[in-house]
Amino acid sequence: MGNSEIAVVPISAIEHFEYCPRQCALIHVDGIWADNPHTVRGSRAHRRTDDPTKSRKERGKRMLRAVPLWSERYGLSGRADVIEVSEDGTVRPVEHKSGVRHGITADLQVCAQAICLEEMLDTSISEAAIWYGGPRRRFRVDLTPDLRRRTFHAIKEIRQHLVKGVLPHAPNDSRCPQCQLRHHCLPETSANAAEVAVYLQQVLSV
């Protein structure tokens, strides 16, 4: 199935979706974006990996930076921070994050990168990696069947939002205070929209 037949999902949308489907829709359906200290720090952390001219060899491995990725089969497109190529030809994507590890949101993103690389290079990739700037530590990500299944599920859900233009309900939970789109999302108001609608119906029916 080619990209001409399905909506292309940005790889970056996968992490947004896993964090909050409403945040993902605001960014990738409505085109809304705002920075906060977390996103600014992330942008600064990516300055080095965003420059393809910085590709070089480290410890016997080629480090290719800012590599465009795509998958015709799954309708994906994006860019890898770093593609690590070992002397034996082994390839793995390495995602760079400025903060600390929280759950598997970034794991899904780097898994999607590996899926693209497998198609582009006609190869199999068993592991990827994520480098976190907070602890300055690299974590290995095993590309297990379960992780791939969750990644494909996220891709499917995101594509439905893109096609239908659906804006999910706001969760209005512990994620919201840290979200850079809080003032666009209005979680307190959105989460209570159904209650407000019922109240208005009751008032107008009197």
Report residues per predicted region.
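Metal-dependent nuclease catalytic cores that hydrolyze phosphodiester bonds in DNA/RNA
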Residues: 1-91, 98-101, 192, 199-206
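Cysteine-cluster motifs in flexible loop/terminal segments that predominantly coordinate metals
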Residues: 20, 166-206
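Nucleic-acid nuclease catalytic cores
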Residues: 72-78, 84-165, 169-183
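Juxtamembrane/interface motifs at transmembrane-helix termini
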Residues: 45-48, 114, 147, 190
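Short, charged/polar low-complexity linear motifs in solvent-exposed/disordered segments
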Residues: 43-44, 110-112, 157-158, 195, ...
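A structural signal for alpha-helix termini and helix-coil/disorder junctions
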Residues: 31-35, 51, 157, 161-164, ...
